[in-house]
Structures are given as C-alpha cells and as structure tokens.
Amino acid sequence: MAKVYLFLGNEEYLNKVKIERIIKESVADEYNINYYDMEEKNVSFAVEDAQTAPFLCEEKIVVLRHPKFLTTAKLEIEHDIKGFVKYLNNPSPYTIFIIDASNLKLDNRKEVVKVLLKVAIKEESESLSDVEFVGWVIRQFSQNNLKISQRAAQTFFK
C-alpha cells in the first residue's frame, strides 16, 4: 500500500468511498485513524501525528480534509508548509497519509503541490454521466449482495 494518496475531482462522494476502501484494506484500527480539517488546524498537527508511531498496531492513517493551502485561496491559518514538504519527501513507513482535495483547484506553481504530485498516488473522481451513474448504483447494490433493476437505479438521479 502506498504511503501518500491525493484525492482530486468534483465527486466528493466517490472520493470518500475510495478513502474508506483504503482505510478498510489497511491494518490500522479505529484508534490509529485520525482526521484533520485544514480550515481549523495547522498541517503541522497532522505531520506530527503521522510521524508518531501507531498505538498497539502496525500502521496508522492520517487524513487531511479541506487542504486549501494547496490552492490560491486566502487562508485564516498560516500552515507549516516547509514541514509538510519535508514530510512528503520522506513519509513515515508506518503511516498512510491521505489528502482529500475534493472540489479544490490546486495551484501547480506552489512547491508543495509539485512535491505532492510527484510523491503521491493521485486519484481523480469526475462527475459521472447518467449511464455511468446508473451502472455505479447497480454495482454498489451488487457489492452489498443486493439487487436493483436499471429502472429503479435511474430513480436515484431523477
């Protein structure tokens, strides 16, 4: 499993499902999964957590939400970007670091974005067409051992 993931695109729900799948496939237990909202906390808290050994477990997961410091947006919090870049260049071997940048347009001129795009596994979720959406709904039902007709699945987006 990779050590750094970056989730992009405007389908927040699909990104959430992919993130949950990574969490489920990891060996981290609920005490070693931490979420940080970058609109409320400095990225240094997440980096410090990522560098701390997991508690009675082999691995831990750190998830960043709303990392607007990767965009051109004006910020209320001054983030420790240098510390984050340093971490990205040498991620912890026992931490899966997930950045959920759903619905954000990254500023590719920033050093942190360049490093992130270089080191992270990038997952991008775009809006589904009506046909793709129906297929996706049917697959979700099937994965949960349930059945749904195509017509019934179409009612989800009417």
Which role does the model predict for each range below?
Residues M1-K158:
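Conserved beta/loop motifs at nucleotide-recognition and modification sites
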